[in-house]
Each structure stands twice: as structure tokens, then as C-alpha cells.
Amino acid sequence: MDRYDDRLIVKTNLIESYEILMEFIAKHTSDKFYLVDNVRTSVRDLISREVVSNILVHRDFSSAFPAKVIIEKDWIRTENWCRPRRQGNILETEFTPYPKNPILARFFVAVGLADTIGSGVRNLYKYTPIYTPGGKPELIENDVFRINIPITETAVYEYAEENELTERETTIFKM
């Protein structure tokens, strides 16, 4: 079989949507053993928490474009319509946190489903390489905000090949 779809259409309130999406990601991805201060911690759940809260909090609800969580063999990907403040990749070292829906952001922080504004980007950059050695999240802000999280080492190599600089680009970058 070339394709397997386990689709989930979520049309409920934000709290239930959060729980349903977290369960969906847990169902289709493996959890790896990791200790934080001698306590077993689910890195998968830490990553999922940031991904799910991002698509719920930063969504542009005036658009009919459906938010998506896509789990592939090697990747977790999201697509979410948003009002971009800038275009292109969001890097850990050069981004300015900006809540697209500040009331929702404060609510998610108050009920414990998110941390402070901007912590999601930092946490994705922190936990993705722990979950997938050598992996880095890819966050792309355009009209459709995309997050790509590698979940296998194959995805890490695939990403490196796709984003490898040419000799000319390397020379220009070093200038």
C-alpha cells in the first residue's frame, strides 16, 4: 500500500482540540526515553505540546484554510493559515515573539497549555535534536505557517541534502 490515512477532523472547542491532537500525535509517533533531573520526561510530548498549541493559538480564524497536523514516516508537519509579520524561516537566534491572538495566548498560558510567548520556538529548537539526533525544526512563516519536525535520522539527512549550500553560496555566506 502506497498510502495510509488515519484522518482526524477536529471541530470542537480549543481545550478538547488540544487534547485530541496530542492523543493523535502520541498514537502515531514513538516516545523515546529521556531523563530531566532524574525524572522520565516525554520529549515527544514536549514537542507535540509546542506544535499543537502553536496551531491553535496563532491561527487566523478568519480564513477557511484548515489547520493540519500531518504525520509522515519521517516527519511531523503542520500547516496553519496565519497573518505573517515577516516572511521566511524563523531561527532560534533571530526572531521576535509576537502573539497572533494575544487573548488566546494568555488563556493557553493561564491554563498551562503553553508557556510564555516565544518559548515554543526555543523549546522546539531545544527538544528536536534530543528526539532526533542531529535534527532541527523548520519553522516557515508565510501566509501558511509551516512547522516541519524530523522524527527519524533519515529526515535529518534529507533536510541536510535539500538545504546544502552550493560552493558559490558558501563563499558569499563567508563574506
What kind of feature is each model-predicted range?
Residues 1-175:
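C-terminal regulatory or interaction extensions
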